[in-house]
Amino acid sequence: MANPKLTLNDVLIRPIITEKSFSGEEYNKYTFEVHRDASKHLIKEAIEKIFNVKVEKINVINVKPKPKRRGIAVGRTRSWKKAVVTLVEGYRIKELEGQH
């Protein structure tokens, strides 16, 4: 269930800047880290308002924490949510184009 206190500016945390995520740009796919309580509808609304584009579909992945060690201390990374956003043909997010 979506958090009622979540605003559109709180939904998107950061774009994912990796080689794999940039390979999807030629298919109009952009990858973002999003708030864990954000729904697909809220993510779509935020992308369309912030970047002035039309969203075709959204795939959401809940990334599970990985075990990590530092000396004898054992811990885990945090869990987070990733959204792969597919834009309607002809739309681009210009702010993310030149970050290769």
UniProtKB/Swiss-Prot annotation:
HAMAP family according to UniProt: Ribosomal_uL23_B (MF_01369_B)
Complexes and interactors: Part of the 50S ribosomal subunit. Contacts protein L29, and trigger factor when it is bound to the ribosome.
Similarity section: Belongs to the universal ribosomal protein uL23 family.
Function text: One of the early assembly proteins it binds 23S rRNA. One of the proteins that surrounds the polypeptide exit tunnel on the outside of the ribosome. Forms the main docking site for trigger factor binding to the ribosome.
Keyword rRNA-binding: yes
Domain of life (superkingdom): Bacteria
Family annotation (PANTHER family): 60S RIBOSOMAL PROTEIN L23A
InterPro entries for the chain: Nucleotide-bd_a/b_plait_sf, Ribosomal_uL23-like, Ribosomal_uL23/eL15/eS24_sf
Protein name per Swiss-Prot or TrEMBL: Large ribosomal subunit protein uL23
GO MF, one example: structural constituent of ribosome
A single BP term in Gene Ontology: translation
A Pfam match: Ribosomal_L23
Keyword line: Ribonucleoprotein, Ribosomal protein, RNA-binding, rRNA-binding
Presence of keyword Mitochondrion: no
Gene Ontology cellular component list: ribonucleoprotein complex; ribosome
Record gene name: rplW
